[in-house]
């Protein structure tokens, strides 16, 4: 009898180990046969987490001089933009560097929404300066520019397109050692302090692209919530929309075990690997913070709890998407911002037309998640509930519309522009918008549902008006 009971228990355990859990949280395809997709194509069997060291705390920026001293830095490049160069975050960094005897030069010509031209200007400054460390103080534009400057200054014989993502660039792996880079984010959106990604507008083709490599992630991110108090309300909102979509897209991305090809060498495994059990945790937690705090952070500039929470959410979502990736909202956003006509966002002090990155991302989100919900609908319903939807009576086949409605309500409550038409786009622009999305295969291929050019056209058309 005892032997028979043991045999039954052993059989049951083997069955449980070979059967994927079907609850909403664990029903993703992580348990399929490694290395082989249902279609027979070779797929990946592993994922890895690459994250910058993060230090969080009110006033933590003043430690930057000690950090650089501990690193042995003697000649530091401090990168920022013209608007921030006279504001407290930069002044605090300069005071800390001076107090700790660190020699530094300031580069304050970073462009909001950088271009290949602005990247190359910063790269030239970095090459001439022969710096042994970098500090980036600002939003994603500053941090991304600094990553690129560090990379190409350490690889002076490389051509600019060598490290740029294919198909626009050659997408070569980064094998050269880089200098230490400390990132001090002053906005709560990009999560760039945690990622090995640097995004820019490639002006010749009028598309956004970037550099993606774990090697370029910052050495340390100093996440100081005091810097969030200076942010205008519209900047808070648009930055928060980036966090929102980072979380939603990484959580609904194709699982890492379904992504192909499987790399022949670990160095070829992309930074954006597909959703995975670790990134999922960060994405969901970030989404809960956005749902609870973003509206408060926008409506009350003095709400330190809300703005501090959003600053952390940006880093959390960065950890998630920095390893899982994003997909259609981001892939479609690049031509939206790159083909901007005359639109100038409120509360952005720039001398050129500008669609803020977070706004360009979130405007397509209702259409995108209606489209993608055919795959992994449980995850779409789960995120809709986090955003406030009542899903108790929702049918699984309605997951897309339920999430889309939750997003529309969220955006409407924050007075977001009524779709792409409000930015100056019309149906006549859709072919150009689709053309600008096609080179973004690095992210669009992570969408849980494949898309044709006709699908992209329909998504842009559905995003012309939200309400």
Swiss-Prot record:
GO terms for biological process: glutamate catabolic process via 2-hydroxyglutarate; lipid metabolic process. It is found in: Mitochondrion. Signal peptide: none annotated. Its EC number is 1.1.99.24. It comes from the Eukaryota. One of its GO terms (cellular component) is mitochondrion. SUPFAM superfamilies: Dehydroquinate synthase-like (SSF56796). Expressed in kidney and liver. The modification N6-acetyllysine is found at residue 445. One of its GO terms (molecular function) is alcohol dehydrogenase (NAD+) activity. Its main location: mitochondrion. It is an enzyme of class 1 (oxidoreductase). CDD domains: HOT (cd08190). It catalyses: (S)-3-hydroxybutanoate + 2-oxoglutarate = (R)-2-hydroxyglutarate + acetoacetate; 4-hydroxybutanoate + 2-oxoglutarate = (R)-2-hydroxyglutarate + succinate semialdehyde. Keywords: Acetylation, Lipid metabolism, Mitochondrion, Oxidoreductase, Phosphoprotein, Transit peptide. Catalyzes the cofactor-independent reversible oxidation of gamma-hydroxybutyrate (GHB) to succinic semialdehyde (SSA) coupled to reduction of 2-ketoglutarate (2-KG) to D-2-hydroxyglutarate (D-2-HG). L-3-hydroxybutyrate (L-3-OHB) is also a substrate for HOT when using 2-KG as hydrogen acceptor, resulting in the formation of D-2-HG. PANTHER family: ALCOHOL DEHYDROGENASE, HYDROXYACID-OXOACID TRANSHYDROGENASE, MITOCHONDRIAL. Belongs to the iron-containing alcohol dehydrogenase family. Hydroxyacid-oxoacid transhydrogenase subfamily. This is Hydroxyacid-oxoacid transhydrogenase, mitochondrial.
């Amino acid at each position: 009898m005892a032997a028979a009971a043991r045999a039954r228990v052993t059989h049951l355990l083997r069955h449980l180990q070979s059967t994927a859990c079907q609850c909403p949280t664990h029903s993703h395809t992580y348990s399929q046969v490694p290395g082989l997709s249902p279609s027979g194509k070779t797929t990946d069997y592993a994922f890895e987490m690459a994250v910058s060291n993060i230090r969080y705390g009110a006033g933590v920026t003043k430690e930057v001089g000690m950090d650089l001293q501990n690193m042995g830095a003697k000649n530091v490049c401090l990168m920022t933009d013209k608007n921030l160069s006279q504001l407290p975050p930069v002044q605090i960094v300069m005071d800390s560097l001076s107090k700790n005897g660190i020699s530094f030069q300031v580069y304050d010509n970073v462009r909001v929404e950088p271009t290949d031209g602005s990247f190359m200007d910063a790269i030239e400054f970095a090459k001439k300066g022969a710096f042994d460390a970098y500090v980036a103080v600002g939003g994603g534009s500053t941090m991304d520019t600094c990553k690129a400057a560090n990379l190409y200054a350490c690889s002076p014989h490389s051509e600019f397109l060598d490290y740029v993502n294919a198909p626009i660039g050659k997408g070569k792996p980064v094998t050269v050692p880089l200098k230490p880079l400390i990132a001090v984010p002053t906005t709560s959106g990009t999560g760039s302090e945690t990622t090995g990604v640097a995004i820019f507008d490639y002006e010749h083709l009028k598309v956004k692209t970037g550099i993606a490599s774990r090697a370029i992630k910052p050495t340390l991110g100093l996440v100081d919530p005091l810097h969030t108090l200076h942010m205008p309300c519209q900047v808070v909102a648009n930055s928060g929309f980036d966090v929102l979509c980072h979380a939603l897209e990484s959580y609904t991305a194709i699982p890492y075990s379904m992504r192909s090809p499987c790399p022949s060498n670990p160095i070829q495994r992309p930074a954006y690997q597909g959703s995975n059990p670790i990134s999922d945790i960060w994405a969901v937690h970030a989404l809960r913070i956005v749902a609870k705090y973003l509206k408060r952070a926008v409506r009350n500039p003095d709400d330190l709890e809300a703005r501090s929470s959003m600053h952390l959410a940006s880093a959390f979502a960065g950890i998630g998407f920095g390893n899982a990736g994003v997909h259609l909202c981001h892939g479609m956003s690049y031509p939206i911002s790159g083909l901007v006509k005359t639109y100038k966002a409120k509360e952005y002090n720039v001398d050129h037309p500008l669609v803020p990155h977070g706004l360009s991302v979130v405007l397509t989100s209702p259409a995108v998640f209606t489209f993608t919900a055919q795959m992994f609908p449980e995850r779409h319903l789960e995120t809709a509930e986090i955003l406030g939807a009542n899903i108790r009576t929702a049918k699984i086949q309605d997951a897309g519309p339920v999430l889309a409605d939750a997003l529309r309500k969220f955006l409407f409550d924050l007075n977001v522009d009524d779709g792409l038409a409000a930015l100056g786009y019309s149906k006549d622009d859709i072919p150009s918008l689709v053309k600008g999305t096609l080179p973004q295969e690095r992210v669009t291929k992570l969408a849980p549902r494949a898309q044709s050019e006709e699908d992209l056209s329909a998504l842009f058309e559905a995003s012309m008006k939200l309400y």
